[in-house]
Amino acid sequence: MAKLTKKMKAIKAGVDSTKAYEINEAIAVLKQFATAKFVESVDVAVNLGIDPRKSDQNVRGATVLPHGTGRTARVAVFTQGANAEAAKAAGADLVGMEDLAEQVKKGEMNFDVVIASPDAMRVVGQLGQVLGPRGLMPNPKVGTVTPNVAEAVKNAKSGQIRYRNDKNGIIHTTIGKADFSPEQLKENLQALLAALVKAKPTTAKGIFIKKVSISTTMGAGVAVDQASL
């Protein structure tokens, strides 16, 4: 097992792992230890009351955070005709069909999000082995396969996050940067939790959101008291 650095030991010593912190206090703790030479991301882990082994209980979707994520996504759009012009006008970084597919096959993937109109899936479908492992394959469940590509581009550019539970039923995503104000981080977290509650599977029983923890890129997790949200 790797030894803890002095910084990580100090962080762990400053966080009570048995306590669920009031949200403003939790954010203050994160900011206190966010001392990396770069602006750290603020990540969240949400433990859900689901059985991830059952396909009808898996949670997947997307939501736009009110204050964004602190970074602007590069967006590639597979579409043609009027939709291509609309995508460009909405701010898409790359737009095309077979020509864009050829770039992807060559490993030229300078983008963070891939959007496709339904008629373009015949082209995108051939890229599954390349885009799939990177989590870039367009999917109607998260709004990246849509006839309204312009709206999807605007959402991606304005701070939309995608989420999907892992094999343990936990959602991992980002809610901003360490230099966001406490209110911005709180409102982003509230928006995410509201989206998750809305996406609750009808077959999930009992407490749905069981635990919420936030952390910075280089920091320890801090449990959040949900009553403070």
From Swiss-Prot:
<dbReference type="GO" id="GO:0019843">
    <property type="term" value="F:rRNA binding"/>
</dbReference>
<dbReference type="GO" id="GO:0006417">
    <property type="term" value="P:regulation of translation"/>
</dbReference>
<keyword id="KW-0687">Ribonucleoprotein</keyword>
<keyword id="KW-0689">Ribosomal protein</keyword>
<keyword id="KW-0678">Repressor</keyword>
<dbReference type="InterPro" id="IPR016095">
    <property type="entry name" value="Ribosomal_uL1_3-a/b-sand"/>
</dbReference>
<comment type="subunit">
    <text>Part of the 50S ribosomal subunit.</text>
</comment>
<protein>
    <recommendedName>
        <fullName>Large ribosomal subunit protein uL1</fullName>
    </recommendedName>
</protein>
<dbReference type="InterPro" id="IPR023674">
    <property type="entry name" value="Ribosomal_uL1-like"/>
</dbReference>
<dbReference type="Pfam" id="PF00687">
    <property type="entry name" value="Ribosomal_L1"/>
</dbReference>
<comment type="function">
    <text>Binds directly to 23S rRNA. The L1 stalk is quite mobile in the ribosome, and is involved in E site tRNA release.</text>
</comment>
<dbReference type="InterPro" id="IPR023673">
    <property type="entry name" value="Ribosomal_uL1_CS"/>
</dbReference>
<dbReference type="GO" id="GO:0006412">
    <property type="term" value="P:translation"/>
</dbReference>
<keyword id="KW-0820">tRNA-binding</keyword>
<dbReference type="InterPro" id="IPR028364">
    <property type="entry name" value="Ribosomal_uL1/biogenesis"/>
</dbReference>
<keyword id="KW-0810">Translation regulation</keyword>
<dbReference type="InterPro" id="IPR005878">
    <property type="entry name" value="Ribosom_uL1_bac-type"/>
</dbReference>
<dbReference type="GO" id="GO:0000049">
    <property type="term" value="F:tRNA binding"/>
</dbReference>
<keyword id="KW-0694">RNA-binding</keyword>
<comment type="similarity">
    <text>Belongs to the universal ribosomal protein uL1 family.</text>
</comment>
<dbReference type="GO" id="GO:0003735">
    <property type="term" value="F:structural constituent of ribosome"/>
</dbReference>
<keyword id="KW-0699">rRNA-binding</keyword>
<dbReference type="InterPro" id="IPR002143">
    <property type="entry name" value="Ribosomal_uL1"/>
</dbReference>
<dbReference type="GO" id="GO:0022625">
    <property type="term" value="C:cytosolic large ribosomal subunit"/>
</dbReference>
<comment type="function">
    <text>Protein L1 is also a translational repressor protein, it controls the translation of the L11 operon by binding to its mRNA.</text>
</comment>
